[in-house]
């Protein structure tokens, strides 16, 4: 697997509202109504990450979840990162503020 080109990343980010490039990663901060909603999102996303065998760097503080996706093997952004970001967006649509 190889990293996506800058142009490929930019095209993918157009379809991922709120996601931004940060160096060799894509990042997003999610805001939920409360801690339970934030944890629910993280739990659901964890199952997707495990199924894809691609795990996020993330943190949680009460109702906020910060996500960073990168592929360590390539040192850049790959289709695995984009795929997991899209799955996260699918989970969060009705829950995120």
From Swiss-Prot:
Keywords: Lyase
Matches recorded under Gene3D superfamilies: Transcriptional coactivator/pterin dehydratase (3.30.1360.20)
Lyase as UniProt keyword: yes
Documented EC number(s): 4.2.1.96
Lineage: Bacteria, Pseudomonadati, Pseudomonadota, Gammaproteobacteria, Moraxellales
Gene Ontology MF, one: 4-alpha-hydroxytetrahydrobiopterin dehydratase activity
Record InterPro entries: PCD_sf, Pterin_deHydtase
Reactions listed under catalytic activity: (4aS,6R)-4a-hydroxy-L-erythro-5,6,7,8-tetrahydrobiopterin = (6R)-L-erythro-6,7-dihydrobiopterin + H2O
PANTHER family recorded: PTERIN-4-ALPHA-CARBINOLAMINE DEHYDRATASE
Origin superkingdom: Bacteria
GO process annotations (BP): tetrahydrobiopterin biosynthetic process
CDD domains the UniProt entry points to: PCD_DCoH_subfamily_b
Pfam family, one: Pterin_4a
Family membership noted in the UniProt record: Belongs to the pterin-4-alpha-carbinolamine dehydratase family.
Name of the protein this chain belongs to: Putative pterin-4-alpha-carbinolamine dehydratase
Species assigned in the record: Psychrobacter arcticus (strain DSM 17307 / VKM B-2377 / 273-4)
